[in-house]
Amino acid sequence: MWDQPAEAAVPSKNDVSGVQQVWARLLGDAERIQLPTKFLKALPPGFVHIEFDDLRTYAAEYHPDDHRMVLDRSLSFNAAGRELKPLSKMSPRQLEVLYHELFHAYVDYLSVSEAPSDGRGRPADALLQFARAQQACRYGVVEITPIVQRRDATESRYLTQTESWEALNETWAVFIGWAVWNQLEVQGKTAQSMFREPRHADHWMQRFKAAFENGEFRGYYVPEDPDERRLTQKRYLAQQSQLGLEEAMVLMNQALGFKQDFIDRLRASFESSGPSSCSDEGGSAE
């Protein structure tokens, strides 16, 4: 991040007002099409800076060092690269990408808020506490797929703190994006929340169970070792190390704001798969 004079770093009142309007419009769009807003409302306007570029390798990137989100120009209004396209004009897949990146920004915000940069760290958010517990006991040692196309060929890896945090962060963001995409798919063009239509809620649950059983909620990490990074830029987790069921329930409750009776029904639909090594640490879906 470029150094600049202190006075140049202070936004004008017009800048602040403009940022607040953009964020208010995003929240309003999300509410109108019945999408989750719980974690979005916890993000202060202006925390994340959104940019657009012609991205060729990835649909989006998030840079926590300067809280910057880079989206493909296709997610901008008229593909002009100046402002975010109205959410109602985005496809379900585009909204999946957007929510994935916005969740990265949310976790970044929680981490920054926790950091005692002024000597007085804010008490850790419950979701962040839960994340730290999961990082320690689920993402410290993982199974990976060295060859992505061969999902059954796996290897064990001991991850560094940086690698395990990225693996968790990406895995959780994959689920958040998936949850939003599939909510839009089951709601169709009815503009009615799936929580008010039992048939839609059941359809989402069926999709979730199928995705969970197929091991679709898997993140990745970038190896810290330079020699390994010369071989591959990303290591993808294997199905054995995908998102845990308890993690999904906590994210539904604390990040997405799903209704508790919906979460309880979904939990009851799963046969007991044994105790989670982290189930009693850091938080739960209340």
What is each residue range found by the language model?
Residues A136-K189:
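Metalloprotease/metallohydrolase-associated module, dominated by Zn2+-dependent proteases
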